[in-house]
Amino acid sequence: MWWREHRGRILALARLGLVLGAAGLLAGCFEPLYGSNPSVGGGSVRDKLAEVLIPPIPVRQGTPQARIAVELRNALQYDFNGAAGAVAPTHRLDIVVSPTDITVIIDPVSGRPIEEIGALTASYKLVEIATNKTVLTDSTFAHVGYDIPGAQQRFAKERARLNAQDRAVQVAAEAIRNRLASYFVAGT
């Protein structure tokens, strides 16, 4: 019988047809995160993010945490609102940051650290301003490694640490933005 000889081909075509059919059905379920979405009150996620107020992050002035707090707040404000004008806020984002530096590798000859990891943990809660009710509580972290050059380069260690902090802030800001966008789309 001819079908026994071509059984492998027939099964492969049947599998391919099932996969393509399932992909076609699931394509109708796709919804872009930043597109217009009637389930978020008629506006887009970008509009909802623009309505989030980000107050100054509470830290002691003059500390390394103060610089990180300002950078994180600025990154989030730019991500949420860009250069657009002020919008009446519907939510408030309260953030607490705690940065740390962890020595990973020590030079066996000099005993000085040659590589460190800058760790940044940001805990945040989203509060609905009208009811003063916390609707979302979460935290995020970022670990960024950096090399420490030898003793001849006096300011290179500080510059490397600041660059690592800037990268960690961008990672944390992106994670917070994505989590809030997910909240505004799915409500969870």
What spans do the regions from the language model cover?
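Short, well-ordered turn and helix-capping elements at secondary-structure junctions
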Residues: 5, 58, 80, 99-101
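Sec/Tat-exported extracytoplasmic proteins
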Residues: 79-84, 128-130, 175-184
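Surface-exposed short loop/turn segments
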Residues: 83-139, 143-163
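N-terminal, post-signal-peptide region of Sec/Tat-exported proteins
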Residues: 68-90
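C-terminal/domain-edge helix-coil "capping" segments
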Residues: 152-188
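A structural "domain/chain start" motif
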Residues: 2-20, 24-74, 185-188
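Conserved acidic
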Residues: 64, 68, 114, 160, ...
